[in-house]
Amino acid sequence: MSSTGSARTEGDSWDLASSVGATATMVAASRALASRGPDPLLDDRFAEPLVRAVGHPFFVRMLDGQIPLDTDDMPMTLQQRREQITVRTRFFDDFFRSATAAGIRQAVILAAGLDARAYRLSWPAGTVVFEVDQPEVISFKTDTLARLGAQPTAERRTVAVDLRDDWPTALRDTGFDSSARTAWIAEGLLPYLPPHAQDRLLDNITALSAPGSRLATENITDMRVFTDERARAMRSTWRQHGLDIDVAELVWLGERRPAGDHLEATGWSVTRLPTERVYADYGFELPDNEILREFRQAISYLSAELG
């Protein structure tokens, strides 16, 4: 147990069926559900086969319709979770589209997990997409998509390194060009980093970025939202269906400087977008849900440009 109240420890590890890795699989499962139907909310045809390849029974049953998406015994239903991930995914998709429309041809996805943007987005010719994550995660996704016959839609370069290690050197060694403008995303990552590691991550991004580079992430002002008893109550309901995960034990608590404030202090122009505005931009209304109200106050979306 860390001094900040998290069950996480420095240097801990996981796979895609446990701990932090299971949250990445849950995101992919939500993307898979949102990609179904005649008028899908998303277009991520790779999410479902990736989740099935992970093989966690809860997420397989979720895809098979054996777990109710909308039930009153959850403080935040899986249906609301699916909508949240839909909005978040589309925000980061559009961030990359805007960056490449502005001429940026180098993209970095930090903690890529089961993210399939290098395969499913329409990248301009000459775009290089770097995916950074733990070696086991990178290998699993690469091998699974290869078995499906999937081909990247950009030049995909994998950087198999833990973000707590010297990932900037590993990124450069894979051909990253720090003199070129870059579009960076850190989607759903920051809560799982200790406060000092979040600052170090942002400082490394700044050091690697040429003027005109762009970054998108979440801006978190209050980590207590992750330890609310209503959020913890989800664990007992999930456990009944076979998923023993408590997000409150996976995040790092304690005081941290909001990413937007840190970036502004290091030369970035920052735009903060309230959660309800981003929901509205994609045709959704933020549910009148106690947990989501707390998240709305504590977390916003952030885009930034250097210089």
From Swiss-Prot:
Gene3D superfamilies: Vaccinia Virus protein VP39. Belongs to the UPF0677 family. It holds the Pfam family LCM. It comes from the Bacteria. This is Putative S-adenosyl-L-methionine-dependent methyltransferase MAV_2732. Exhibits S-adenosyl-L-methionine-dependent methyltransferase activity. The keyword Calcium does not apply. GO terms for biological process: methylation.
